[in-house]
Curated annotation (Swiss-Prot):
This protein's UniProt keywords: Cell inner membrane, Cell membrane, Membrane
Function field: Interacts with the SecY protein in vivo. May bind preferentially to an uncomplexed state of SecY, thus functioning either as a chelating agent for excess SecY in the cell or as a regulatory factor that negatively controls the translocase function.
GO cellular component: cytoplasmic side of plasma membrane
Pfam families (UniProt xref): Syd (PF07348)
Family label: Belongs to the Syd family.
The species this protein was found in: Cronobacter sakazakii (strain ATCC BAA-894)
Protein name from the UniProt record: Protein Syd
Topology versus the membrane: Peripheral membrane protein
Protein location: Cell inner membrane
Amino acid sequence: MQNEVQQALAAFSARYCEAWRQQRGSLPVSEEYIGISSPCIVSTHPDAVEWEPQPFTPEDSLGAVEKALDIVIQPDVHAFYASQYAGDMAARYDDVALTLLQAWSQDDFRRVQENLIGHLVTQKRLKLSPTIFIATLDSELDVISLCNLTGEVVQETLGTRKRRVLAPSLSTFLSQLTPLV
């Protein structure tokens, strides 16, 4: 049975794919995934792949991140990163344009975990409260993250205490995203 985050992520992913169908007449197409295998690939073209989200199998979690840093990560983040394989998806939340990060494959999921470990180690070194990034912004210094203490979704400037709460929960945040094609 899916939890709220998995349901909200699946619903946004469906809206994203439908927006592609309506505006471009196809499933999402990405140039950056050419030559990288994934269960998401529906068809390969000379300069891009057409893809759609697929269930995350085998079941997994961010346990490696928890073990490496001896912390407990919010269950919502496990559900976000380990419920589906998909390409990164462009979206808007209120006035904020963002790219929602996803794991493209099992290898990519391992890379995501390594990046999360690096992010959390840096935060610990700087004595910042822990966050788990879930989306990027045009500015390379700003990301959208889930606060691991409160469960709130925040826009933060990396390496600083500058944070702005966007949503009270990850499921609320995901349900209010508008796909950008």
